[in-house]
Amino acid sequence: MSRVAKKPIDLGKVELNVQNDNVTAKGPKGTLSLAKPAGIAINVENGVATLSTESVDLIPLTGTVRAILSNMVKGVSEGFERKLELVGVGYRAAMQGKDLSLSLGFSHPIVFVAPEGITITTPTQTEILVQGADKQVVGEVAAKIRAFRKPEPYKGKGVKYSDEVIIRKEAKKA
């Protein structure tokens, strides 16, 4: 097995239920489930989960399942968040109920409806915070918001991740 698959998952206060080909993680931030591939065994003992397989063909998949399970456990206990910044004159974000309203230089504001299980907040007019238990969905929502106006390389205007570094280009010289 891979090094990732051999590493045990510390559950902490998370309750992990394995029933047939379905794994459910329940914690303070919510509940997540995963359809487990047949042939991969998940053993839960003393607050630690380990994975094993008999099939040589499933060895690479075991590491992937372990990483997804680890993210599920972290998500339902701590949660995940992604921070976005709006750079540009007149670029603003505001919450209208549960919907996010973005003014990004278009002729109309963009209204983004958050999917189930995702919380979007705006600490300031130029910051957006996407939070949730499912790492994949949090990243997907943040990418969709960023796609409305990607940062451009000349002035750096647009929606960017807070930790993203935009490589700048020099303007054309006459």
From Swiss-Prot:
Q: Report the superkingdom from the record.
A: Bacteria
Looking up Pfam families in the UniProt record yields: Ribosomal_L6 (PF00347)
A single Gene Ontology CC term: cytosolic large ribosomal subunit
Q: Which GO terms describe its molecular function?
A: rRNA binding; structural constituent of ribosome
InterPro entries according to UniProt: Ribosomal_uL6-like (IPR000702), Ribosomal_uL6-like_a/b-dom_sf (IPR036789), Ribosomal_uL6_a/b-dom (IPR020040), Ribosomal_uL6_bac-type (IPR019906), Ribosomal_uL6_CS (IPR002358)
The Gene Ontology biological process terms listed for this entry are: cytoplasmic translation
**UniProt keyword list:** Ribonucleoprotein, Ribosomal protein, RNA-binding, rRNA-binding
Q: Which Gene3D superfamilies match?
A: Ribosomal protein L6, alpha-beta domain
SUBUNIT field: Part of the 50S ribosomal subunit.
- Family recorded in the similarity comment: Belongs to the universal ribosomal protein uL6 family.
Please explain the role this protein plays, according to its UniProt record.
This protein binds to the 23S rRNA, and is important in its secondary structure. It is located near the subunit interface in the base of the L7/L12 stalk, and near the tRNA binding site of the peptidyltransferase center.
Name recorded for this polypeptide: Large ribosomal subunit protein uL6
Which lineage ranks, top first, belong to the organism behind this chain?
Bacteria, Pseudomonadati, Pseudomonadota, Gammaproteobacteria, Lysobacterales
